[in-house]
A protein has these predicted regions:
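Helix-to-loop junctions at the C-terminal end of transmembrane segments
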Residues: 160-174, 258
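Intracellular juxtamembrane helix-capping segments at the cytosolic ends
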Residues: 1-6, 214-227
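Short amphipathic helix-loop junctions that connect adjacent transmembrane helices
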Residues: 130-147
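Juxtamembrane intracellular "pre-TM" segments in multi-pass secondary transporters
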Residues: 78-116
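Multi-pass alpha-helical transporter architecture, strongest
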Residues: 65-76, 269-295
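Structural signature of the two symmetry-related core transmembrane helices
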Residues: 176-191
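Helix-loop junctions at membrane interfaces in 12-TM secondary transporters
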Residues: 193-205
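A membrane-interface helix-boundary motif in multi-pass transporters
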Residues: 37-64, 256-275
Length: 295
């Protein structure tokens, strides 16, 4: 939807701002979960903390939150005119278009290189999201409240990073923003694998958050700039698919390495490998000339 909603010269900024808004929503949701369920679930809502009812209730809270704040988008965001083509025909035509694009892989080789790179480094980001809390609990003995507070801090720095780097995306290009962000992720992840003091875990962890937003926002912007106008829907479909297709590989690798070496630290090094591999693949992606603008 992004290329249809904003001018090309503002695509990077709006992508960054929207990610920042998402992180702001995450902060509010985490605060709600912390104070309503984790800290006061038993006293206020009668939840049994012995059976972890207060923890499980946060999943319901998150689902309701997601539903409620999706409604404005469905009601207010402009959409393309309605097409009366039967659903079955739409699916058939879409699959045929995808088949044709795969046959023309050489023509879209640059886009596929980007999708491959993004697939790899996005797996690393998914691992950080999924196992960061487990690592914090297992290695630094952080409890549920501390992990949620840490998550709030990560969302704050991620929102600031998404806003701060959004101008760089438009002025210097999405590829440079992605590469800088990946390097900005590699350095803190490396440090976190070696620090022993929880204070330094917090410092490096919050620094890690600064680059979460930019790498994701700039990836979306670059896809919007690389995709031909008549293939945007298809290419963004592949973009979404590339973010999910191999999402199971990272956790599997992390689990195997952790068990093999009996160490969470060594297991989390999988994140570093994926980030570095994604960085190297991104070097081969060619970006269209950046949009010239004076705003």
């Amino acid at each position: 939807m992004l290329p249809d909603l904003v001018p090309p010269s503002y695509m990077g900024r709006w992508s960054g701002w929207s990610w920042a808004m998402g992180f702001a929503g995450g902060i509010a949701c985490l605060l709600g979960a912390l104070y309503l369920f984790i800290e006061n679930g038993e006293a206020w809502l009668g939840l049994d903390i012995e059976t972890l009812e207060n923890i499980r209730a946060t999943f319901v809270f998150t689902a309701v939150w997601y539903l409620v704040f999706s409604i404005p988008m469905f009601l207010r965001t402009p959409d393309i005119p309605k097409n009366d083509t039967p659903v079955g025909q739409v699916i058939q035509e879409g699959l045929q278009q995808l088949k044709n694009s795969i046959k023309q892989a050489r023509k879209y080789a640059n886009i596929y290189r980007f999708l491959l790179a993004r697939m790899i480094y996005n797996d690393a980001i998914i691992l950080i999201y999924a196992f960061g809390g487990i690592y914090a609990a297992g290695t630094f003995a952080m409890d549920e409240s501390q992990i949620i507070i840490f998550g709030i801090g990560l969302n704050v720095t991620a929102a600031l990073g998404a806003v701060g780097f959004s101008w760089m995306d438009d002025r210097s290009g999405s590829k440079k923003t992605i590469l800088l962000s990946l390097m900005g992720l590699i350095i803190p992840v490396t440090a976190i694998l070696f620090v022993e003091d929880i204070f330094w875990f917090w410092i490096w962890g919050l620094m890690l958050g600064v680059f979460f937003g930019p790498v994701q926002a700039a990836s979306r912007t670059l896809m919007g700039r690389l995709a031909p106008e008549d293939k945007r829907t298809e290419m963004f479909g592949l973009f979404a698919f590339s973010g999910k297709a191999t999402a199971f590989i990272g956790p599997k690798l992390l689990g195997w390495v952790t068990v093999l070496f009996a160490s969470q630290r060594i297991g989390m090094s999988v994140v570093l490998v994926l980030l570095a591999f994604g960085f190297l693949l991104m070097l081969r992606v060619e970006e269209p000339d950046k949009i010239q603008q004076t705003n």
